[in-house]
Swiss-Prot record:
Keyword Hydrolase: no
Transmembrane regions: none
Alphabetized Pfam families for the sequence: Conotoxin
Name this polypeptide is given: Conotoxin Ar5.1 a
InterPro entries, sorted: Conotoxin
GO molecular function term, any single one: ion channel inhibitor activity
Signal peptide positions on this chain: 1-19
Length: 77
């Protein structure tokens, strides 16, 4: 008598139509948010490193130009 209701409950829990538990939804939301944050941080780090490299390259080019000719150097007073 008790086996049939238990069997039905187990079938409902194991069926693919059963909704995800709340904890699983929260975990998937947190994982998705963490991945989005990681992507944004990587983009910011890449852009800042590129801009930093461009500044360094510009200084090197300016120093080389100043050593060759004084026309590209800033006037020193």
């Amino acid at each position: 008598m008790l086996c049939l209701p238990v069997f039905i409950i187990l079938l409902l829990l194991a069926s693919p139509a059963a909704s995800n538990p709340l904890e699983t939804r929260i975990q998937s939301d947190l994982i998705r948010a963490a991945l989005e944050d990681a992507d944004m941080k990587n983009e910011k780090n890449i852009l800042s490193s590129i801009m930093g490299s461009l500044g360094t390259i510009g200084n090197v080019v300016g120093n080389v130009c100043c050593s060759i000719t004084k026309s590209c150097c800033a006037s020193e007073e």
